[in-house]
Amino acid sequence: MKRALISVSDKNGIVPFAEKLVELGVEIISTGGTKATFEQAGIPVTGIEDVTKFPEMLDGRVKTLHPAIHGGLLARRDTAEHMEAIAAHDIEPIDLVVVNLYPFQETIQKPGVTLEEAIENIDIGGPSMLRSAAKNYAAVTVVVDAADYDTVLTELKEHGATTFETRQRLAAKVFRHTAAYDAVIAEYLTKITGETFPEKVTFTYNRKQALRYGENPHQDAAFYTEPVALLNSISAAKQLHGKELSYNNIRDADAALKIANEFTEPVAVAVKHMNPCGVGVGENIEEAYLKAYEADETSIFGGIVALNKEVDAKTAEHMSKIFLEIIIAPSFSEEAFTILAKKKNIRLLTVPFAGSVESLEKTSVNGGLLIQASDSFVEDSAGYEVVTEKQPTEAEMKALLAQWKIVKHVKSNAIVVGSDKQTLGIGAGQMNRIGSALIALEQAGEKAKGAVLASDAFFPMDDTVEAAAKAGITAIIQPGGSIKDKESIAMADKYGISMVLTHVRHFKH
């Protein structure tokens, strides 16, 4: 290895790396700020303009886009015609490229960043050099990650060159990196244009965690997050204590957080297998947790609990009495953390309940991807319609609105029975609506008397209304829209139940 081209925005570790290269007899070529850094460190360096015989121009937009650079990168060492061609133009081969790119992603995250600032942080020369070097990895070593500096130096010391396997691995890493870089730019500009579903989509994710296994032990898995994760998401969570999260933990935690984010008042959400098993609302977080626990004392065992307010000592004492996989909250008081951390394996996570919700949902199918707007539609209850003779009382309406927030997060067909403070029965995932209703009503038992019922979609027949009435339900909320709405309304009138139509469906598959 004779020549290295180094041009980096992130200069961490670059000086000792370059010093070692010089000790190994490698000539360093560099640009702008990187060159100045080397000169200050006393490292011999050749300026890029001395190689190209052309000055930087357009405020630095054009520096390395030159045949003297790309010819030296792309020439195949095993092809005589290539080597003769670069020799004829006094171009020397470049054996090592070390480049990291302008911080576009970091730039667009800054508050108040302008489009012009973002545009000026789109790197052109850097990706071009990386791609040229990576294409010719048979002869050229390319480094885009400082974590690979030591590997390259070790192989150079031991063999005088990097191995083919290392060059191939680093080239693949470069193409992933440049693809991800371009994807962030494409997504940023696409959002500015207002296109939601363009003809081509590009998304990039970073591996956050290797997982022991997936949904089942025979399935391999890893957890990837968006470059800029939403603040109130599992992707942005910080783990304070406990074992590593599993695949199922992450999915359940995501489901719990989505429900907790529906409420501004103190709420506790218990989830099993991505369905809520208990949701409680209270004047304080202790009351909210106790309501969630009482909603289903059996199913909460081994579950995930999300709370939207700080966990205090009293709440922690209650939670420490049962086995929970995960507790997620904005924060834990010092005393609460001490109480809960006595359990070695419990996972304690913090998530700031702030910021926006995911605007798009992505679901993979074999050979494709379904993308839809998230079910975060802000409903105006003023548009709801009472269609029965009996009007819901103020207390019933409060309960209906609370359960309506919850039912949309239950797998369809979904029925939720509850009050304004808690769920009392949840019927999820049945292939017919009456089946889900019977499960929810049976779970609620005697507590169904005086409670309300929420349905994520319309009633195809009046049997659910009749079952609800016989169990003691006093008010129902549902979208409406069935050709048999009149029959369901008549059944409600027969039993003196109030019914509210929202005209908004909340299927969840």
Swiss-Prot record:
Record-annotated MGS-like domain positions: 1-144
PROSITE patterns tied to this protein: MGS
A Gene Ontology molecular function term of the record: IMP cyclohydrolase activity
Pfam families in the cross-refs: AICARFT_IMPCHas, MGS
Sorted UniProt keywords: Hydrolase, Multifunctional enzyme, Purine biosynthesis, Transferase
Pathway noted in the entry: Purine metabolism; IMP biosynthesis via de novo pathway; 5-formamido-1-(5-phospho-D-ribosyl)imidazole-4-carboxamide from 5-amino-1-(5-phospho-D-ribosyl)imidazole-4-carboxamide (10-formyl THF route): step 1/1; Purine metabolism; IMP biosynthesis via de novo pathway; IMP from 5-formamido-1-(5-phospho-D-ribosyl)imidazole-4-carboxamide: step 1/1
Keyword Transferase (UniProt): yes
Catalytic activity annotation: (6R)-10-formyltetrahydrofolate + 5-amino-1-(5-phospho-beta-D-ribosyl)imidazole-4-carboxamide = 5-formamido-1-(5-phospho-D-ribosyl)imidazole-4-carboxamide + (6S)-5,6,7,8-tetrahydrofolate; IMP + H2O = 5-formamido-1-(5-phospho-D-ribosyl)imidazole-4-carboxamide
Protease in keyword set: no
EC code: 2.1.2.3, 3.5.4.10
GO cellular component, one term: cytosol
Gene Ontology biological-process annotations: 'de novo' IMP biosynthetic process
Cysteines engaged in disulfide bonds, as pairs: none
Protein family (similarity comment): Belongs to the PurH family.
Record note on domains: The IMP cyclohydrolase activity resides in the N-terminal region.
Name of protein: Bifunctional purine biosynthesis protein PurH
Species of origin: Listeria welshimeri serovar 6b (strain ATCC 35897 / DSM 20650 / CCUG 15529 / CIP 8149 / NCTC 11857 / SLCC 5334 / V8)
